[in-house]
Swiss-Prot record:
Name of the protein described by the UniProt record: Signal recognition particle SEC65 subunit
Matching InterPro entries: Signal_recog_particle_SRP19, SRP19-like_sf, SRP19_arc-type
GO biological process: SRP-dependent cotranslational protein targeting to membrane, signal sequence recognition
Highest taxon listed in the record's lineage: Eukaryota
Entry keyword Ribonucleoprotein: yes
Family from the record: Belongs to the SRP19 family.
Length: 310
């Protein structure tokens, strides 16, 4: 036989009147509204709110100290700012065209970030996309994807468009393309656990094809080097720099038979900046096309003839 039990409808089982303090009732003067954006607004005391804010500040300070002690964490923080559109940290290069970031190796050293921290990143040179180069001379893309006068700053813009962490080293040159400085280091890994943003680049070959397509859509013009971040940085440090988009330098003079771009970056050693530099060209020619050394003169040896009588 079923037994009916009368149940009290009042839910006061957890309430102890002895613990009630009328002075602790939350009022407009003592309450703070708290919400995490996912649920209803909670009322907490202002003292509790101040305690939580203080703990949050201490946690942020500890994270900042850890990032300063860890160069890779500092580098990753810069990459996060780049990918979120927050710009570059101060004293870490200049920003020119939208999507272009410039990092100089010396500035990384000043920030206690060594080149060894990103030595395993893929390196991309402009010569890989030069239409006037053969495969043996450094070209790495098919001829139909190659372009005229490729520049490192355009490669950096392409990597930024692809949301790839990249570093533009404006002074670095390829041994077979000494007149066209500028290379880009690219991180192709896609690991959210490491804070690396997702991307659609499959491998290095796919990356070269995407960069080549970007270069096809953004051909190099004579004013292109003077619209990039390197030129902006030079103007800031040297306002009397003679060349700009309206006053272009004379075209570089190469030794006969050399295949070199006609449009070069500002930092190219082939640009004389208005003055002929024959000594530099001679040194370059001797460095990359050394002359065959002549054999030392040999001393004449006197030959003695002896007659033998019969």
């Amino acid at each position: 036989m079923a037994i009916l039990e009368e149940i009290d409808d009042v839910d006061n089982m957890d309430f102890d009147p002895a613990e009630f303090d009328p002075r602790a009732v939350l009022t407009d003067a003592t309450a703070h509204q708290e919400s995490d954006g996912r649920g209803p607004i909670n009322l907490i005391s202002k003292a509790e709110h101040e305690r939580r804010e203080q703990a949050k500040k201490q946690q942020e300070q500890q994270q900042e100290q850890q990032q300063q002690a860890n160069p890779m964490a500092q580098l990753q923080q810069m990459m996060d700012q780049m990918n979120q559109g927050g710009g570059m940290p101060p004293n870490m290069g200049q920003q020119g065209k939208p999507g272009t970031q410039v990092f100089d190796s010396e500035e990384f050293k000043n920030q206690e970030i060594q080149e060894s921290d990103f030595k395993d990143w893929q390196i991309v040179y402009p010569v890989y996309f030069d239409k006037n180069k053969t495969v043996g001379e450094g070209r790495r893309v098919p001829l139909e994807l190659a372009v005229e006068n490729p520049l490192g700053q355009t490669i950096a813009e392409a990597c930024k468009m692809l949301t790839l962490p990249s570093i533009y080293e404006a002074h670095k040159t390829h041994p077979k393309d000494w007149a066209n400085p500028g290379r880009v280091r690219v991180q192709l890994k896609d690991d959210p656990a490491l804070g690396l943003p997702p991307h659609s680049v499959k491998n290095k070959r796919h990356l070269f094809r995407l960069i080549a397509q970007y270069m096809k859509e953004h051909p190099t013009k004579e004013v292109t080097p003077y619209q990039g971040p390197v030129f902006q940085k030079i103007i800031q440090t040297n306002p009397e720099f003679p060349w700009n988009s309206k006053n272009l330098p004379p075209k570089p003079q190469y030794p006969r038979g050399w295949k070199m771009p006609e449009i070069l970056p500002i930092l190219s050693p082939a640009l004389s900046h208005g003055e002929a530099n024959n000594d530099m060209m001679e040194q370059m020619a001797n460095q990359f096309m050394p002359k065959i050394p002549e054999a030392p003169p040999q001393q004449k040896v006197k030959k003695m003839k002896v007659r033998v009588g019969r």
